[in-house]
């Protein structure tokens, strides 16, 4: 079954915000969905993509109810080529076989299907007097930063200094494996960033280049970030590296592999 709605279920009645109807029967609907062999919730509203697994609600086929929060084709309300969290303006493609979703992908509106991530230098400085690209407000992955006339805070994480940071916008925390390779040999597994952070490069673009001035542009609700310490501690000096992300579709076992071998160091494509 595909259950389509507008506002996400993922926080249910516990979510804040004026858009949430706390009298709606979120839990009751989730329970009803478990009576089917497979269940997917298709929603939008957020202007960023996010996958959410309802682990407490398992279907007759043995897989949890899976919620697909779709990013917007118009992105951040046509202000650039991105959704508010840095994912490209996008839509999703689904391959259905019989009574099951065999495969799916989130596709950027101006990108090839294989474009599924950006990889950053966790030590890079954006904006400020010492940052590249330049700008009024200074941001780093490890310290965060503040910007706009409202002094909006963007959170950082100290673990990210000296690390490769991958933003993978169609990921989830159960069905993806992200690995780091050098010279064709695996160095290690990348880990989820242990605290909520935004895409710092994207935040700098929004505040320094587009003049944004609200917390919408520092969103940390959807976490798509993985990291690993760079060999030698400086990502810019590492040669012949690759971040490889492997997605296993939970309902079919289908496997998708995506790769990135270049650092995103500026706002190109934004």
Predicted regions and their residues:
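Metal-dependent phosphoesterase/phosphodiesterase active-site architecture
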Residues: 56, 61-270
């Amino acid at each position: 079954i595909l259950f389509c709605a507008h506002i996400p279920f993922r926080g249910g009645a516990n979510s804040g915000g004026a858009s949430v109807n706390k009298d709606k029967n979120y839990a009751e609907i989730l329970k009803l969905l478990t009576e089917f062999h497979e269940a997917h919730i298709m929603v939008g509203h957020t202007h960023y993509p996010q996958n959410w697994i309802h682990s407490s609600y398992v279907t007759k086929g043995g897989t949890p109810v899976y919620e697909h929060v779709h990013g917007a084709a118009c992105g951040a309300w046509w202000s650039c080529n991105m959704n508010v969290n840095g994912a490209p303006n996008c839509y999703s493609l689904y391959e259905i076989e019989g009574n099951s979703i065999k495969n799916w992908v989130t596709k950027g509106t101006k990108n090839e299907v294989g474009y599924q991530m950006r990889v950053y230098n966790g030590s890079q400085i954006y904006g400020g007097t010492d940052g590249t690209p330049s700008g009024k407000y200074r941001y780093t992955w490890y310290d965060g930063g503040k910007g706009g006339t409202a002094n909006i805070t963007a959170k950082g994480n100290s673990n990210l200094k000296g690390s490769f940071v991958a933003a993978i916008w169609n990921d989830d925390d159960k069905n993806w494996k992200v690995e780091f390779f050098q010279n064709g040999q695996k160095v290690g597994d990348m880990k989820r960033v242990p605290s909520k952070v935004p895409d710092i490069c994207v935040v700098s673009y929004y505040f320094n280049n587009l003049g944004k001035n609200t917390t919408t542009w520092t969103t940390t609700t959807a976490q798509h970030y993985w990291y690993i310490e760079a060999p030698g501690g400086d990502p810019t000096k590492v040669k012949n590296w690759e971040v490889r992300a492997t997605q296993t579709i939970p309902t079919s076992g289908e496997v998708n592999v995506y790769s990135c071998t270049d650092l995103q160091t500026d706002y190109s494509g934004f």
